[in-house]
Amino acid sequence: MSQKSRHLALSLVPAAILAGACAPQPAATTTPTPVTLPAKIGTNPFFVESSLPYHAPRFDLIKNEDYQVALEEGMKQQLVEIDAIAKQTTPPTFENTIVAMEKAGALLTRVSKTFTGVVGANTNDTLQKIQDAEAPKLAATNDAIYLNDQLYQRVKSVYDRRSAGNLDPEQVALIERYNRDFVRAGAQLSEADKTRIKSINQELSKLSTDFTNKLLAGTKVGALVVDNPSQLVGLSNDEIQTAADAAKQRGLNGKWVLPLRNTTQQPSQAELTNRAVRQKLFELSTLRTERSDTNDTRSTIRRMAELRAEKAKLLGYPTWAAYALATQGAKTPENAIKLLTDLVPPATARARSEAADMQKLIDQQGGGFKLQPWDWQYYAEQVRKAKYDLDESQIMPYFELNNVLQNGVFFAANKLYGLTFKERHDIPVYNPDVRTFEVFDANGQPLALFYADYFKRDNKQGGAWMDQFVDQSALTGWKPVVYNVANFTKPAPGQPALLTYDDVTTMFHEFGHALHGMFSNVQYPTLSGTNVPRDFVEFPSQFNEHWALDPAVFANYAKHYQTGASMPAALVAKIKNSQTFNQGFSMTEILAASLLDFAWHTLPAGSAPQDVDAFEAAALKRYNVDVPEVPPRYHSTYFSHIWDGGYSAGYYAYTWSEVLDDDAFAWFREHGGLTRENGARFRDMILSRGGTVDAATLYRNFRGRDPSVEALLEQRGLKSSDSIAK
């Protein structure tokens, strides 16, 4: 997998939880109406603001049962506060309505943000039961706010007079965001339609949680279990030991377990020499939630697609995709689909050429079989070795996790932005794997708190993501508390954590999101940090990936974990020369997943398919991404991004943002690359602005023009393939 094939979702917990608190979520130290706390205040750490630095969560005090009590009380408090705002007799103003809403729900925000982080990265049966019980209630609380006509009339009054007062641009942006969100929630609908919207939201919240639980269980159960290490020939001794340790953790002594990653293709397929084992691993991956058992998600996703289409129709949109993209940079599904389909010819042409190279190698080796999806990773690695004299085992000793983090990711942030980092061992964490760092600005002032949780666990959702326990806001005076989560293979005890190059770029990617949150410099929580359109939020993260191969950065972290020797220049050259290798596959699997997402979410109301597999096959064929050897990065039944990750009709955002990030990096190359001056400009014009300015305007101000797709084609090595429509 290439750097651009890694995915990141800001969070992979259910969207019902993400949006459960008043959306946009507030974060405040005061509330407009005094609320009497229950007697349990003495034992529940959520009922008081954290006394830790940066108001970090009190993981040393929080017990599982505290979440449910605090969520329930938080919802009650918020509704009392909102009711007081709605029923004011004084005329609506920016302060008594909009700012009051920003300050409402402090307890609910505090607990929901913490719960979101823990249930995604360190869940258990108790937390899952709480999630099941509370998600519908959180959705109902959200509806009680955004479908409150009395409250909406106050918001609308402020909105209608936004140009008449002495409001600054950020205040106007906040008013416009609130009005937009009320309208999109259904505030202008009839009472009958509001009732139906509430019912749909309740069911969707339950289905989203249902999907999450099924996928987590299906992924765990779907792991490859082998009885004999001879089946694992090709894996390193450390990898085989890690598989043995994974089996022991499951009570399977004397066996070996390869846990599934969240994607269709599995990293181990690149090394396993036994073709039957590769096939078995591939099939376990693709069928993880499609076995007609309790973890089967087919009925869940059909119903979700059906309900989303119905909701969109009630809100005046022809499809869910039209509704979802109305607030995005792409504006319409047609615009997003055009970008994707324009990229299909060069991507699939390259993929077929890559497949031909592999088939030639198979034939030369007397394989006697046709290349299949489970063969791709293995033979791609063989071709890479032949073409570039490079294989993963050569480079992993130079990518030790802590070295990559501190001398790579942090080093680049220092050179660009002047940041420094100090590990804190006194901040409690939710799992022993988690590390905490205090981040200081160039002037030495405290900027943020950063949590790093990189190793795979069975109770952690798949993939990698960033989110925040605390949002930056001048209104509250709070600084950001940010976390990165990944699923890197945990080494055996006493062994170093050695990363693939793909893992390295994942670290840079997620930290790009973290910087977006840390550098936020806005007044209001709703507009803070990563609260931007989905097809813009991936821009800072994907942009940050580019620094992984910057000569100065790479030389600082790519050092042998045993000797400390820098990676030999010849090996560095091989890595750089191979950057466009396998890009046909990488681009095609992403395009296939993105277009599959649109196939589901451009369905009109009442047309959800009965046969998921047949629908998917027809969609891939319709969009000309049905390359047999290159399945979608995610099949429908385990496509977490679009069913429970907040990216419904939004997976295209990675490609849309890639146009921005490659084009922006071209600007950096033209202006001296890794310099503090360039970093300051990017921070000031992009990373610090949150959602206070239209995303397209932000980019245009930074670049001096609209983005061009040319840099993406060059970065991917696709310019020599079939021409692309401009």
Regions found by a protein language model. Give the residues of each.
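N-terminal helix-rich structural modules
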Residues: 28-242, 668, 726
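Short pre-active-site segment immediately N-terminal to the catalytic Zn-binding motif
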Residues: 489-508
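Bacterial signal peptide processing site
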Residues: 23-25
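C-terminal, non-catalytic "cap/extension" segments appended to globular domains
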Residues: 35-62, 66, 234, 242, ...
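C-terminal motif of bacterial Sec signal peptides marking the signal peptidase cleavage site
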Residues: 18-21
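Short His/Asp/Glu-rich catalytic/ion-coordination signatures at enzyme active sites or charged loops
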Residues: 51-66, 115-134, 157-199, 259-299, ...
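Bacterial N-terminal signal peptides that target proteins for export
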Residues: 2-10
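Active-site-proximal, well-structured secondary-structure segments within enzyme catalytic domains
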Residues: 170, 174, 203-206, 213, ...
